[in-house]
Amino acid sequence: MKVRVAIIMRGLVALAALCCGAAHAEPGYYVVTVYDDPGVKTVDFRYWTVKPRGSSEITWPEVGLGWNVNGRWYTELLASYIGASKFATRLDTLNWQNDVLLTQGQYPFDLAIHTLLIRPQHPASGYALEFGPALQTDVGRTQLNFNVFFERGFGSLSAQPAELSYQWQMRYRWTRWLHVGAQGFGEVGPWDHWLPHEAQSHRAGPALFGSIPAGPGTVQWQAAYLAGKTYAQRGNMFTMRVKVDF
């Protein structure tokens, strides 16, 4: 559960029954990885779904434009939409992501600082800032990622305490064009006073990754199916992402 809970809930009155009267986190974000591709630009397409047990499926299609400004700084503007069987898909948030790489191979791991500014599109909704360290290392042909993020609300969301979440990923370079692995995400509640375990959200599952040459650039894709808890309830998630680098 995170500050983003309130952002989503203000726009999901039709799904109030799902929320059981409490705030719940937006559970779908993608594993932040360390970038080191100076000058590369990206068109970013994302799509993910959440299917809580006994409730209708919620979908989040997203589209973004990214730019590796140099060997240390990646920035992206992202529009996130939301939809369900009970209402039409609409613009939900505008997001600005910035990742700054602090190390470049001089240590056994690479460290980046990640920030994400989240601006909801419904009235009187405030905004939120996600920030924290992103770690990446390689063990043989396996890439490992682990990230810890804090999220703080401002404006009408300022009453929400700063929340703590985590991400992890294992990615084995099986062939040149296909990698296999796993991903996991979780939200534990306020950073300095974790929720009871039964009220936390944790989910994990298998993931596939691939890349396809496309003229002067590359099309990269990934997909994952995660099981566990979303909204502190049992529910499954499917995520898919396609990046066109040029």
Where would I find each of the regions flagged by the language model?
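Cleavable N-terminal export/targeting peptides
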Residues: M1-Y29
